[in-house]
């Protein structure tokens, strides 16, 4: 069942929070920044993951905090090519591939609830 709500996604009782980002994102603005502020260790683990695994757009990376909150980072944008550059815009194919991976993750892990913003409509630049 899908229920549309408004408000601060960080206050959600959902088991999982998912959002769209770019590989090597610096989590400096938008929801990513709020997540970085709420779970600094997630950002540290994310940086390590990106440096060692070199993720591609259209995939995902999930993280679970000490409070059992799960954050799924959907790679909906191309990575910045050089240090200090902005990442590319989101594309519908990247969003679709990442959402398919999210569905597989939900099915395999038996997640019961998910909070998902309007993907890639802020920094990603897509229309809702």
Predicted regions and their residues:
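Macrodomain-like recognition of ADP-ribose-binding/processing modules
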Residues: 1-128
